[in-house]
Every structure is written in structure tokens, then in C-alpha cells.
Swiss-Prot record:
This is 5-methyltetrahydropteroyltriglutamate--homocysteine methyltransferase. PANTHER family: 5-METHYLTETRAHYDROPTEROYLTRIGLUTAMATE--HOMOCYSTEINE METHYLTRANSFERASE (PTHR30519). Its cofactor is Zn(2+). One of its GO terms (biological process) is methionine biosynthetic process. It catalyses: 5-methyltetrahydropteroyltri-L-glutamate + L-homocysteine = tetrahydropteroyltri-L-glutamate + L-methionine. Keywords: Amino-acid biosynthesis, Metal-binding, Methionine biosynthesis, Methyltransferase, Repeat, Transferase, Zinc. 5-methyltetrahydropteroyltri-L-glutamate binds at R16, E17, L18, K19, K119, R524, C525, W570, E614. Catalyzes the transfer of a methyl group from 5-methyltetrahydrofolate to homocysteine resulting in methionine formation. L-homocysteine binds at I440, G441, S442, E493, D608. Its EC number is 2.1.1.14. Binds 1 zinc ion per subunit. It comes from the Bacteria.
């Protein structure tokens, strides 16, 4: 039969045991021995559950105490000087967690900021960015991989250690200090891979998986050349080597990947099914091909019949050289569907989490040589029933939603008048001062707010009691904003647990799991909502809260919504329709809410698109199509209102240059952005492009409890006013204030309002 394997398994545990142990360790409630015991138990359980599901070659090295890239940094001795405890023989778990979370001033290292964290390709997982110096030296400094191989082999498992490849590891890092080419470090790094391979061979390992996902990116020629050189050098080292690619197609790197002097190649046929015939034609006859046929990034069951067509064809061409796997590591999938006890039977039958995906992989591998086996036939029959159910279910397919989608006209995604005409009407109606002050939406989520929400969900608070509790929080937020002298107020979002979940709970077509947790980073786990069907809004979602807030003040109250692209990017999407279609459905639902807010007397509506840039495809040639439908979805949700109603959007990331035209195409009247940490340098993109609409550059960093002085904010605003005309500038924090405490929030806003008033004085004096 074909060989069944996985590229990695979720490390958090069925009940998030790793998260609980990490946090107990950080609080001093669990010692290192206790933490390590939890790790051993989880690894043993995860290997066994994969083996029981039919996986023949088990991944080792996919477990990490915080993040797999960080584990590699410790393994290679890539530890910034600020985390090196002098006198210690080598790195410890305290070193690892210090690199991830920072070190307080009273520790042995005297205080050190954490390493930068960023998204792992186009997933919602985050990794710790390696920091390289020009004189970087590499040395094996962390024994975790070898210890875990011994653990797994002692339990009787056939193992396949997993390593991030040398080129991907260097690509993911950043040069610190003097500028230099990271490829200059390759010759220093490669000997460590040789050492690792030799040690693994000595432990009885036969195969090693080397992850090189950057092969699905647009690579400079120098990096392509480096692949050939690196793997030619590694060719002489022991072990059979499987190079794993995922998250996309190899495209122009296909020939390079196919001809690397290794023993096998894994390809993602979920994201890029079209690459299958070319790979088979280009691959040398001695190589194993691992086909990623089960989606490792989503929660839907595999269409086994469709996947089996590929397996049968591959079996004829490859014989014993065929392996079957998920498309990528199952790190991005929840752990076990069997934990779900609140889903109805039909919906649950459509889903598969990591454990179930292992079984699907095993069935496909077995079907290659035993197509008539009872287990295979039963699984195929069940899969056919699931696909038929999903194809015809009225829960999924809503004629009214589809008819509305089909009726969309180009004019529906355009405001009635150009910005210049709209802004004149808005300024006349809103009557705001120069440098108007506002916040991004949320105010501190106190323990009393969280307790009230939890008590209401558990039935301990009646609806009337819950509404009064939230009204009390809204009154408090409005009162403070009026006392501070803010110009445009918000209601504070006390009733919202999460900017996606709050809306998803109120839309038809979404479902929530109880245990569908996935790791975002470290101990942070998220439970994305699942889009299972056509999306619509049965009733207003925010209107009563905002209407109540507006009734408390004569000042302008801003409505707060999450945009369609962000809703989509932070959910598990459908696989049976495109992301574009799902974004349009979400846009129509949000459009209805915007129109209802306007009808309720709300004159400013903010539609947050925090994930707009995150949705960009990995390959540049796919950007134009994404940007076209993403900007259209925003305009569609924002264009149902009169010219007098002002539409804001908020984006929180640090790179605008390459998407500035698309941001302008969204045609929001005001965009608020995160700029304080870049000292307003981000505004250069808006200045050079001559961005036409109004801008609120964030004037202080909400991620820090530090209160900025009035003078600091004045300096930033003056810097901004040199790039953007003063009449188009707003004054606001970088982001929402949900995670801050009230004292620091009030202190910072006092200084922000004072700074805006000083700028108005400058303007008046000319």
C-alpha cells in the first residue's frame, strides 16, 4: 500500500493542556519538571492517536514549547545577546520563553524585549522571527529533537523527524545591526544540518522531513541558486530526505524542487491541484512523491472519491514511491471532532479535525492497493453521503441570498458622489473642529464586563439584567469621553467578546464549535467560527446599543462594525464556493447594518478591515484579483448610505506601500492606521501616492501601558501635518483600547486631546 504520513500534528492537546501548563509555569504555579511531564504526555498521546488512525510514519519535532521556528533558533544557537544569561552552560526553557515573551527588568538578564512575531505565511499562526547578525555563529545548543526521537522510538514508533529547511529558516529571519545578505550565512548554517542528520542516523532514523515552504513563493534568482548549492552539499549526509512544500503551488520553482538531490518531495494538492501532472512528468524515477490531498488548514471532510482518483492514477505511475498526507501540518486544524458534543448530527458529519484527517489519509493510502477492503468501501460510502448532503442541504444553499448576490450592480459598490462632494456635506453636517479626536472603538474590557457576559451566557443573568449591565458600561464610557473632551465618541463595545465572533454569532450561515481551538502563538489559542452556508443577517446586530449610546450625548456617536474581508480571513471558510463569493455575502449583510445605523441617526460608521492585507496571496501574480474583490466587498458594504454619512475604516499593520492604490480604491471617507511605532514614517506611502481622503494616523501605541506625553503626541502630529494637509488629519490612538486599563487609558487620552487643541492653536495662528 501507499505510505500514510503526516507533516505535523497540533501540539496544544484536546483540552488545551499545553496552554494551561505554559501559563501555570509562567505564573510560578508549575515547576519545570511538571511542564516537561505535560509535554511528554501530550507527545505520547499525539503519536498514539495518529498511529491508531493508521498513520505509519509519525512526525517528531513538530512539538514546540512556544513556536517551531523559535525551537530551531535555540537548536542552532541563534540567541540574541540580550537573552544570554552569563555563566549558564546553554539555553534553558527560561531562555526560550524570554525570547518569546520578553524579560522583565528585575530578571537575571536585566530586561529584554521579546523577538518580533509575525504571520506564518498566509495562515493565522504566528512565529518568532530569528535575529541574525553579520558575524552570526551557529552551534547545536538545544537537544529537544534528539530527546523526542528517543522518546518516540522507546514507545515503538516509526518516526520521521521534522526540520525547517536551511533556506526557509534564513528567509524567515531578519538581519540585525549592519545590513547584510542573509544568504551569506548559509555556508555557516549547513554544517549543523549535517551534524543533525548524522546524529539522527545514529538514533536509527531512516527518513527526515525538511520543510521548505518558501518554494511556493516568488524567489529571487540568488535564492534559487542557493537551493541547488545547499542540497548538493547535504546530499552526502546520511538519511533519506523528504523536502516538504505547502500553502501553494511550486509554479516557476517546480523544476528546481523536482530536481533537488533528495529522496522525496511533498506537494500541496489542496491549494494547487493543477501542479500534479507536471510534478509527475518532471520528477526523477527514483523519488518518492508525497501527495497532500487532505486539507490541513480547514475543518471540512475530504471528498475521498475525488481524492482517490488522484491516488489511483499516482499509484499506476509511481508504484511504491507514492505517499499520502495532509496538505500541510495539522497544526492549523482543531484536534479532535469527537470532543464536540453541541453540534447537530448533520453539521458534525460534514467536519473533520486533525484526528479525523489522519483517518482520511490512512484510508486513501490503503485504497491505493486495497480498493475493495471493507474499511475503504465503508469510508467511501460515508464520504459520498456527506458530499451529497452538503451539495443539496437547504441549510447551506439559500435561494434568497443567491438571488440578491446575482442582482448586484456595479453602482451598488459606489458611493453616490465623489469624495470631494461627500466630504463638503459631511463637514457641514458634523461641524467638527480641525484635528478631530476619536478612538478606534473599544474601551477596557474589565473583569465585571466579562463576568456579566459569562453570567448571561450561562443563564445566571436575565436578558433585562444583562442589557442594564451593558447600558451601565456604555454610560460610563460616554461620560468619560465627554469629560475628556473627545469630539467623536464610541459606545465602548462592552457587549463584544471578539470583533469577529460577536457578528458571526448573529449571522445565518455561521456555526461555532466548543473545542475547535487552534494555536495562534505560544499559549494563545483561537476558536475560529465556521462558515458552513450562505450568509445573511436576520436582524440588526448593533443598532440598539449604538442608538442607546447616542441618546446619552449631543456629540457625534460612531457605529462600529467588522468588515467582510476580516470576517472571512479570521473564520474557517467554505470550500464549495470561492472566498470572493463569501466576502460578497458578508458585505451585503454588513451593508444592511450600515443602512440601519444611518436610519437610527448615526452619522459616522466605522468598518474595520484589520485583515485586509493579510488576505494577500503568497504570489504577486495573484494579488490583482484578490485586491479587486476585497476592495469591491468593502465598497459594497459601505455604499448604501447618503453622502452625509461618513464611513471610516481602520487598519492595523505596518506596510502600505504595495497596496496603497487598493486602499484608496476602498473609498472610505476616513482611514485610521497604526503609525506611532514607525514615528509617522508610514505616512510616506500616503503622501507619495497623494492619498485623497482623510487620515487618522495613530498617535500612541496601545500595546504598551506607557502613557505618552502631550509633547510627544504634538511632535508626532506636527510630523504628520508635514506629510498630510492639516484639514484632512484626525487624531486617534493606534488601535482599540480593549486590553488596556482605565487609568492609563484616561491619562493617554487627556494628553491626546490636549495635543489636538495645541495643533488647532497652531493652525489658528497660521
Amino acid at each position: 500500500m501507499a505510505l500514510a504520513h503526516t507533516l505535523g500534528f497540533p501540539r496544544i492537546g484536546r483540552d488545551r493542556e499545553l496552554k494551561k501548563a505554559q501559563e501555570a509555569f509562567w505564573k510560578g504555579e508549575l515547576d519545570e519538571a511538571g511542564l516537561r511531564a505535560v509535554g511528554r504526555q501530550l507527545r505520547a498521546a499525539h503519536w498514539q492517536v495518529q498511529k491508531d488512525a493508521g498513520i505509519q510514519l509519525l512526525p517528531v519535532g513538530d512539538f514546540a514549547w512556544y513556536d517551531q521556528v523559535l525551537t530551531h533558533s535555540l537548536t542552532f544557537g541563534v540567541i540574541p545577546e540580550r537573552f544570554r544569561a552569563h555563566g549558564e552552560a546553554g539555553p534553558t526553557l527560561h531562555t526560550l520563553f524570554g525570547m518569546a515573551r520578553g524579560v522583565s527588568d528585575d530578571s537575571c538578564c536585566g530586561g529584554a524585549h521579546a523577538q518580533e512575531m509575525t504571520k506564518w505565511f498566509d495562515t493565522n499562526y504566528h512565529y518568532l522571527v530569528p535575529e541574525f547578525s553579520a558575524d552570526q555563529q551557529f552551534q547545536l545548543s538545544w537537544e529537544q529533537l534528539f530527546e523526542e526521537v528517543d522518546e518516540a522510538r522507546a514507545l515503538g514508533h516509526q518516526v520521521k523527524p521534522v526540520l525547517i529547511g536551511p533556506l526557509t529558516y534564513l528567509w524567515l529571519g531578519k538581519a540585525k545591526g549592519a545590513e547584510f545578505d542573509r544568504l551569506d550565512l548559509l555556508d555557516r548554517l549547513l554544517p549543523l544540518y549535517g551534524q543533525i542528520f548524522r546524529r539522527l542516523a545514529g538514533q536509527g532514523v531512516e527518513w527526515v522531513q525538511i520543510d521548505e515552504p518558501i518554494l511556493v513563493l516568488d524567489l529571487p534568482q540568488a535564492w534559487k541558486n542557493a537551493f541547488e548549492r545547499a542540497y548538493n552539499l547535504l546530499q552526502s549526509e546520511p538519511l533519506k530526505k523528504l523536502v516538504a512544500t505547502y500553502f501553494g503551488g511550486l509554479e516557476d520553482n517546480l523544476g528546481l524542487a523536482a530536481n533537488l538531490p533528495v529522496d522525496g518531495l511533498h506537494i500541496d494538492l489542496v491549494r494547487a491541484p493543477e501542479q500534479y501532472p507536471s510534478i509527475l512528468d518532471r520528477l526523477p524515477a527514483y523519488k518518492v512523491v508525497s501527495l497532500g490531498l487532505v486539507n490541513g488548514r480547514n475543518v471540512w471532510r475530504c471528498d475521498l472519491e475525488k481524492a482517490l482518483e488522484v491516488v489511483r492514477h499516482a499509484r499506476e505511475r509511481l508504484g511504491e514511491r507514492l505517499w499520502v498526507a495532509p496538505s500541510c501540518s495539522l497544526l492549523h486544524s482543531p484536534v479532535d471532532l469527537e470532543r464536540e458534543d453541541g453540534l447537530d448530527a448533520e453539521l458534525k458529519s460534514w467536519l473533520a479535525f486533525a484526528v479525523q484527517k489522519c483517518r482520511e489519509v490512512a484510508v486513501l493510502a490503503r485504497a491505493a492497493t486495497e480498493p475493495e477492503a471493507a474499511e475503504v468501501l465503508a469510508a467511501l460510502e460515508e464520504s459520498r453521503a456527506v458530499q451529497a448532503s452538503r451539495a443539496s442541504s437547504p441549510r447551506i444553499h439559500k435561494p434568497a441570498v443567491q438571488a440578491r448576490l446575482a442582482a448586484i450592480k456595479a453602482s451598488d459598490a459606489q458611493r453616490r458622489s465623489p469624495f470631494a462632494e461627500r466630504i463638503a456635506r459631511q463637514r457641514a453636517g458634523l461641524d467638527l473642529p480641525a484635528f478631530p479626536t476619536t478612538t478606534i472603538g473599544s474601551f477596557p474590557q474589565t473583569s465585571s464586563i466579562r463576568l456579566a457576559r459569562q453570567s448571561f451566557k450561562q443563564g445566571k443573568l436575565s436578558e433585562a439584567e444583562y442589557i442594564e449591565a451593558m447600558h451601565s458600561e456604555i454610560r460610563h464610557a460616554v461620560q468619560i469621553q465627554e469629560q475628556l473632551g473627545l469630539d467623536v465618541l464610541v459606545h465602548g463595545e462592552a457587549e463584544r467578546n471578539d470583533m469577529v465572533e460577536y457578528f458571526a454569532e448573529q449571522l445565518d450561515g455561521y456555526v461555532f464549535t466548543r473545542f475547535g481551538w487552534v494555536q495562534s502563538y505560544g499559549s494563545r489559542c483561537v476558536k475560529p467560527a465556521v462558515i458552513y452556508g450562505d450568509l445573511s443577517r436576520p436582524r440588526a446586530m448593533t443598532v440598539e446599543w449604538i442608538r442607546y449610546a447616542q441618546s446619552l450625548t449631543d456629540k457625534v456617536m460612531k457605529g462600529m462594525l467588522t468588515g467582510p474581508v476580516t470576517m472571512l480571513m479570521w473564520s474557517f471558510p467554505r470550500e464549495d464556493v470561492s472566498r470572493e463569493v463569501q466576502a460578497r455575502q458578508l458585505a451585503l449583510a454588513i451593508r444592511d447594518e450600515v443602512v440601519d445605523l444611518e436610519a437610527a441617526g448615526i452619522r459616522i460608521v466605522q468598518i474595520d478591515e484589520a485583515a485586509f492585507r493579510e488576505g494577500l496571496p503568497l504570489r504577486r501574480n495573484a494579488w490583482p484579483h484578490y485586491l479587486e474583490w476585497a476592495t469591491e466587498a468593502f465598497r459594497l458594504c459601505a455604499s448604501g448610505v447618503r453622502d452625509e454619512t461618513q464611513i471610516h475604516t481602520h487598519m492595523c499593520y505596518s506596510e502600505f506601500n504595495d497596496v496603497i492604490e487598493s486602499i484608496a480604491a476602498m473609498d472610505a471617507d476616513v482611514i485610521t492606521i497604526e503609525t506611532s511605532r514607525s514615528d509617522m514614517e508610514l505616512l510616506e506611502a500616503f503622501e507619495q501616492f497623494d492619498y485623497p481622503n482623510e487620515i487618522g494616523p495613530g498617535v500612541y501605541d496601545i500595546h504598551s501601558p506607557r502613557v505618552p506625553s502631550r509633547e510627544e503626541i504634538v511632535a508626532l502630529l506636527r510630523k504628520a501635518a508635514r506629510r498630510i494637509p492639516a484639514e484632512r488629519l484626525w487624531v486617534n490612538p493606534d488601535c482599540g483600547l480593549k486590553t488596556r486599563a482605565w487609568p492609563e487609558t484616561e491619562a493617554a487620552l487627556v494628553n491626546m486631546v490636549a495635543a489636538a487643541r495645541e495643533l488647532r492653536g497652531d493652525l489658528a495662528r497660521g
